[in-house]
Amino acid sequence: MRVVVSGTHASGKSTLVSDLAAACPPAEVLPDPFELVDDAAAEPDASTFVEQLYVAAARLEEVSGPGRLVVAERGPLDLLAYLDALVELGRPTADPAAADDARETVARAMDGVDLVLVLDPDDVPEPEDEDPDLRAAMHEALLALLDDPDLVGGATVVDVAGPRRSRLEQALRAIGEADSRRPGNVGPPT
């Protein structure tokens, strides 16, 4: 089962992924693509988001196998939302051809995702040094993209909100429900 924890920056993704890994051993954790991009700028820009999008997509397409639980911190849809947010904010973004290619890549990668857990950024204090305008615009763009069945594929989308413990409980419940609908399921999370 492939689970993507999605949300804008500073929304609690790392915390939830860590909590899920502890609650569901031996879950395989895929870290934030930001950590895997060598030239990630201090202030991410369109080229950084595009590179992270391709990293996020490739790793989702590479993981497979029955009985495996894979939890990805941020998926390619998140990075596409950042590109859309840059447009909304009037900031430099990817050229139209690159954006179209990115959408196709997202659709292919998301086709294999079973569950998307979407975090509510309002549950985490907004850090002033984290570009609050981009944070808000990305969240709105992500919600719009999650309504596009061509991009989400067959993934179940579940909003996760509240304090840390409640988020973990909601995520575990969503994983259990999504897994029960899959043939050859991995069993309920512990």
Show where each model-derived region lies.
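Pre-Walker A (Motif I) flank of P-loop NTPase domains
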Residues: 1-2
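Hydrophobic anchor at the beta1->P-loop junction of P-loop NTPases
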Residues: 5
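The conserved Walker
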Residues: 9
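Conserved glycine(s) of the Walker
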Residues: 12
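Conserved substrate/cofactor phosphate-moiety recognition/catalytic segment
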Residues: 15-61
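Short loop/turn segments at strand-loop or loop-helix junctions that form parts
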Residues: 32-33, 73-76, 82-83, 117-123
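Glycine-rich phosphate-binding loop used to anchor ATP phosphates in small-molecule kinases
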Residues: 48-111
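A glycine- and Lys/Arg-enriched "phosphate-lid" helix/loop adjacent to the NTP-binding pocket
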Residues: 86-162, 179, 185-189
